[in-house]
Amino acid sequence: SIGAIAIAESNPDIVYVGTGEEDIRGNVTHGDGVWKSTDAGKTWTYVGLGDSRQIGRIRVHPKNPDVVYVAALGHTWGPNSERGVFKSENGGKSWRRVLYQSDSAGAVDLAMDANDPSTLYAAFWHAYRQPWKLVSGGSGSGLFKSTDGGETWKNITRNPGLPAGVIGKIGITVSPVNSKKVWALIEADSGGVFRSDDGGATWTKTNSERNLRQRAWYYTRIYADT
């Protein structure tokens, strides 16, 4: 199965695909890492991260197609180490893990600021499946921000306005026209849609509709139009 597709803006012949769906329902299908095409999908080359199993998002630098970020969720049914945010600076020839929480929590979403690609937001999800249920939420879930291309990260999970208590799955997006505006769809007892007008420093809940978050393992995506 396919969890993420990213086309390089600077060269649309270059496409990265992350395998394994991040919507880990009962019949989830895992993948075998990241694949790359340099001829618009005619042929493909395997470029690694085979034990990441579920890949939720891939982001490519808008001006340099060799700079790639991968949100790897990891194994569905148990702990493993190949999870978190990975970065390549050579088109997938090698990968470096730049953000990690634990062997039970992985990166499920990534947002890149269209006006400043060195600014990134990463969502982590602490989750695992059992044959009869999904355990969603835990100490590894959270929201993180980097302003230096993923080299360092700040935990913004408990910034003013975001929900307290156990956090589950998170979707994150940045306005393409105003870098200060960020939205997050958060699974939590007091979750919902949250908006920041100051780059994630403070937040306001804009929608508490339970239908948006009650079955987070099926879908937790949010996209900014403006």
Language-model features and meaning:
Residues 1-226:
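Beta-propeller blade termini and top-face loops
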